[in-house]
Amino acid sequence: MARVRHKRKPVAEMNVVPYIDVMLVLLVIFMVTAPMLNQGVKVDLPKVSSEALPQDNNKQVLTLSVKADGSYYWNVGSEVDTEKQTDSAVSLEQMTDAVTKIMSARPDTQVFIRGDKAVNYGAVVGAMGALQQAGVPNVGLITEAP
């Protein structure tokens, strides 16, 4: 007797394994390149610690304050004065010129920024950018203790 052979129907199923491989390769590429993206102002900030930073009394200290309305004030002294601010408001350009002169005269000057908690984030970033243009290598941020 002769056997009757039935034709098999073609399988219409899509193989998704190559797509998963491509997706994983792209994921690895994005994970490697994401930390290399450069965002924001290049300023070398000190690491945050729970203790106050030690003060070097031999170094001059420049304090830049940014009030809630976005106005800039600066004060030069032997220590950071967080209680009183008697200087008059200056523009960002005036502050940059003054800081450039101070840094050229005394390059070891410590620079700190006091930003009001209600101030626009862009005002503090603008101040940090201006300090970078003035040649300040390190900027400290002053906060209140909890």
Curated annotation (Swiss-Prot):
Summary of subunit composition and partner proteins: The Tol-Pal system is composed of five core proteins: the inner membrane proteins TolA, TolQ and TolR, the periplasmic protein TolB and the outer membrane protein Pal. They form a network linking the inner and outer membranes and the peptidoglycan layer.
Highest taxon, organism lineage: Bacteria
UniProt KW keywords: Cell cycle, Cell division, Cell inner membrane, Cell membrane, Membrane, Transmembrane, Transmembrane helix
Subcellular location: Cell inner membrane
Coiled coil: none
Main location: membrane
TM segment ranges: 16-36
A GO term from the CC aspect: plasma membrane
GO molecular function: transmembrane transporter activity
Function: Part of the Tol-Pal system, which plays a role in outer membrane invagination during cell division and is important for maintaining outer membrane integrity.
Record-level GO BP terms: cell division; protein transport
Family: Belongs to the ExbD/TolR family.
InterPro entries: ExbD, Tol-Pal_TolR
Mode of membrane association: Single-pass membrane protein
Protein name as it appears in the record: Tol-Pal system protein TolR
Organism, as annotated: Pseudomonas aeruginosa (strain ATCC 15692 / DSM 22644 / CIP 104116 / JCM 14847 / LMG 12228 / 1C / PRS 101 / PAO1)
